[in-house]
């Protein structure tokens, strides 16, 4: 018997794939045209840029164009011509051309930073555009570093920009960071934070660190003067299951804009020696109440493994192994359950979906409202962990034969939930849906929305 519903789903999937391929081809062709135009205008290729760590000869005077362009900051008493010259001869490396890196780069280039390095291994996606303001719809599929470079050169063609379209790691970090004066950590993962911290301490580079999640943001400067480094504050990385990035927790684009702009400001202050640097202090921004708090953080740790007088770590290590998580902002898939506690989406669709079962969606209510599987019941992970779900499902839990399936967006929170429920009800059949709703879209129903 022909399953017309399955055939229709496959037809829709193929049509969508073909449309995506055509759109991607158009984007790639547009990107190629822009790159060729940039090269024709005299921009160096990546290979030529990265073949040497030497920065151009320092400039000793401002041009008429400089004076006209930067006049509003030149007239600042604490900035002036000498400040602009320092900025013109400076070099800043931005790691991560996402929600923080884009506004930071934009303001540094606009202010007249002479040399900018951009690092990002990833490509532009549509889900980036609400906060990563240098990218555009027609550059989806393009390297983020290259996309940002195109936008930045339109803003200020006098800035020298190097693109590093790769993942920064223990093998290349020292070589990449060495020629720059200041490093901005605009990444979204713990492993990269430790990597940048250690490399910057070893190379004596100040590290301007920013982060943003949901409606909140933070900013500080590590490894500057007598201030602490990142390891002084966090000598041991958090467990992977305790880490939330903006892909999981969400973020409002304007929040990343605020923090990224402040990272640019701190970099400018470091370069020209303006004001008090945020070393030894942490700026906390609460976007919900629009409150800023400036708190003191601990001083240098005398026995810090990296920045102390007798460091135990004198060369870069394997940071993914050290942190137990990937050095990217992509999903770090958890592996908490035994194979018999996991259920593939195709198996669920073909066998269990038509049988009596309890399907619990452990996403927050806001995410459940976006999309949900038929017959799924929303029970947020927080309710499972505090056991408030027990009264709600007391009757179903009495039936040890009733299969219980838990799902989430990508298959991580559902594993945590299965672990918790299984500890209380070890005799029940409780499984999680591998890969969550993303796997459902990829393997079962191509029309189901992805977010």
Curated annotation (Swiss-Prot):
Listed cofactors: Zn(2+)
Keyword Phosphoprotein: yes
Active site residues of this protein: 246 (glycyl thioester intermediate), 408 (cysteine persulfide intermediate)
EC number assigned by the record: 2.7.7.80, 2.8.1.11
Phosphothreonine modification, residue list: 60
Region (Disordered): 42-62
Listed Acidic residues bias regions: 43-52
Residues the record lists as binding Zn(2+): 229, 232, 304, 307
UniProt domain Rhodanese: residue ranges: 353-449
Superkingdom: Eukaryota
Sorted UniProt keywords: ATP-binding, Cytoplasm, Metal-binding, Molybdenum cofactor biosynthesis, Multifunctional enzyme, Nucleotide-binding, Phosphoprotein, Transferase, tRNA processing, Zinc
Broad enzyme group: transferase
Pathway this chain belongs to: tRNA modification; 5-methoxycarbonylmethyl-2-thiouridine-tRNA biosynthesis; Cofactor biosynthesis; molybdopterin biosynthesis
Enzymatic reactions: [molybdopterin-synthase sulfur-carrier protein]-C-terminal Gly-Gly + ATP + H(+) = [molybdopterin-synthase sulfur-carrier protein]-C-terminal Gly-Gly-AMP + diphosphate; [molybdopterin-synthase sulfur-carrier protein]-C-terminal Gly-Gly-AMP + S-sulfanyl-L-cysteinyl-[cysteine desulfurase] + AH2 = [molybdopterin-synthase sulfur-carrier protein]-C-terminal-Gly-aminoethanethioate + L-cysteinyl-[cysteine desulfurase] + A + AMP + 2 H(+)
Pfam families: Rhodanese, ThiF
PROSITE patterns: RHODANESE_3 (PS50206)
Chain sites annotated for binding ATP: 99, 120, 127-131, 144, 188-189
Record text on cofactor binding: Binds 1 zinc ion per subunit.
Coarse class of the protein's main subcellular location: cytoplasm
GO molecular function: ATP binding; metal ion binding; molybdopterin-synthase adenylyltransferase activity; molybdopterin-synthase sulfurtransferase activity; thiosulfate-cyanide sulfurtransferase activity; URM1 activating enzyme activity
Keyword tRNA processing tagged: yes
Compartments, record wording: Cytoplasm
CC per GO annotation: cytosol
Similarity section: In the N-terminal section; belongs to the HesA/MoeB/ThiF family. UBA4 subfamily.
Described purpose of this protein according to its UniProt entry: Plays a central role in 2-thiolation of mcm(5)S(2)U at tRNA wobble positions of cytosolic tRNA(Lys), tRNA(Glu) and tRNA(Gln). Also essential during biosynthesis of the molybdenum cofactor. Acts by mediating the C-terminal thiocarboxylation of sulfur carriers URM1 and MOCS2A. Its N-terminus first activates URM1 and MOCS2A as acyl-adenylates (-COAMP), then the persulfide sulfur on the catalytic cysteine is transferred to URM1 and MOCS2A to form thiocarboxylation (-COSH) of their C-terminus.
Name of this protein: Adenylyltransferase and sulfurtransferase MOCS3-1
The organism of origin for this protein: Drosophila pseudoobscura pseudoobscura (Fruit fly)
């Amino acid at each position: 018997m022909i399953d017309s519903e399955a055939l229709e789903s496959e037809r829709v999937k193929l049509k969508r794939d073909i449309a995506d391929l055509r759109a991607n081809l158009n984007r790639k062709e547009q990107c190629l045209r822009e790159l060729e135009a940039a090269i024709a205008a005299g921009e160096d290729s990546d290979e030529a840029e990265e073949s040497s760590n030497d920065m151009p000869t320092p400039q000793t005077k401002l041009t008429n164009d400089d004076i006209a362009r930067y006049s509003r900051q030149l007239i600042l008493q604490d900035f002036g011509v000498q400040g602009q010259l320092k900025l013109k001869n400076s070099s800043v490396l931005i790691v991560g051309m996402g929600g923080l890196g884009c506004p930071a780069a934009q303001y540094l280039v606009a202010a007249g930073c002479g040399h900018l390095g951009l690092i990002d291994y990833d490509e532009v996606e549509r889900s980036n555009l609400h906060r990563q303001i240098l990218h555009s719809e027609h550059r989806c599929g393009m390297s983020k570093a290259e996309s940002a470079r195109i936008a930045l050169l339109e803003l200020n063609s006098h800035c020298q920009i190097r693109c590093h379209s790769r993942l920064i790691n223990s093998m290349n970090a020292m070589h990449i960071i060495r020629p720059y004066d200041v490093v901005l950590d605009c990444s979204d993962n713990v492993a990269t934070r430790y990597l940048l911290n250690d490399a910057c301490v070893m190379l004596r580079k100040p590290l301007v660190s920013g982060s943003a999640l949901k409606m909140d943001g933070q900013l500080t400067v590590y490894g500057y003067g007598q201030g602490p480094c990142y390891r002084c504050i966090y000598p041991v990385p958090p467990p992977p299951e305790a880490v939330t990035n903006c892909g999981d927790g969400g973020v409002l684009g304007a929040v990343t804009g605020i923090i990224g702009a402040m990272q640019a400001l701190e970099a400018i202050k470091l370069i020209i020696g303006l004001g008090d640097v945020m070393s030894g202090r942490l700026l906390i921004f609460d976007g919900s109440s629009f409150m800023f708090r400036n708190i003191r953080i601990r001083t240098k740790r005398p026995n810090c493994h990296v920045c102390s007088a007798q460091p135990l770590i004198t060369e870069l290590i394997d940071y993914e192994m050290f942190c137990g998580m990937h050095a990217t902002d992509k999903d770090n898939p958890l592996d908490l359950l035994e194979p018999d506690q996991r259920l593939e989406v195709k198996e669920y669709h073909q066998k269990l979906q038509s049988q009596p079962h309890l399907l619990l969606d452990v996403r927050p209510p806001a995410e459940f409202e976006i999309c949900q599987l038929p017959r799924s019941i929303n029970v947020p992970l927080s309710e499972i962990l505090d056991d408030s779900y027990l009264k709600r499902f007391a009757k179903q839990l009495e039936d040890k034969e009733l299969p219980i399936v838990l799902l989430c967006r990508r298959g991580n929170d559902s594993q945590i939930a299965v672990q918790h429920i299984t500890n209380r009800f070890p005799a029940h059949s409780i499984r999680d849906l591998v890969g969550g709703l993303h796997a459902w879209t990829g393997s079962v129903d191509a029309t189901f929305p992805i977010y």
